[in-house]
């Protein structure tokens, strides 16, 4: 499944519990090299980029590594799957 499809599936299928989901991206500026972005921060997604609400932040989809559910640490989608 493409990352765009996985993001949209979570956004629409689990919209009542959307605050329980995060996207994990590669981020050179963090100590771990990873950063979690809550699904509540997502404005939209297209074939190449993830756009965040209220910011001028645009994240290339190739930086997205996984989608995770926080409550039970379940892996919803992972790059390469």
UniProtKB/Swiss-Prot annotation:
InterPro entries referenced in this protein's UniProt entry, alphabetically: MJ1316 (IPR040459), UPF0248 (IPR007547)
Similarity comment = Belongs to the UPF0248 family.
Q: Which HAMAP family match?
A: UPF0248
Q: What is this protein called?
A: UPF0248 protein SSO2687
Per the UniProt entry, what species is this protein from, by scientific name? Saccharolobus solfataricus (strain ATCC 35092 / DSM 1617 / JCM 11322 / P2) (Sulfolobus solfataricus)
């Amino acid at each position: 499944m493409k990352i765009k499809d996985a993001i949209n599936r979570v956004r629409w299928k689990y919209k009542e519990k959307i605050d329980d989901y995060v996207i994990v991206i590669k981020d050179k500026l963090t100590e771990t090299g990873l950063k979690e972005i809550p699904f509540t921060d997502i404005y939209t997604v297209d074939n190449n980029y993830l756009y965040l609400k209220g910011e001028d932040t645009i994240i290339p989809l190739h930086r997205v590594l996984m989608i995770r559910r926080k409550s039970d640490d379940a892996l919803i989608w992972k790059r390469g799957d």
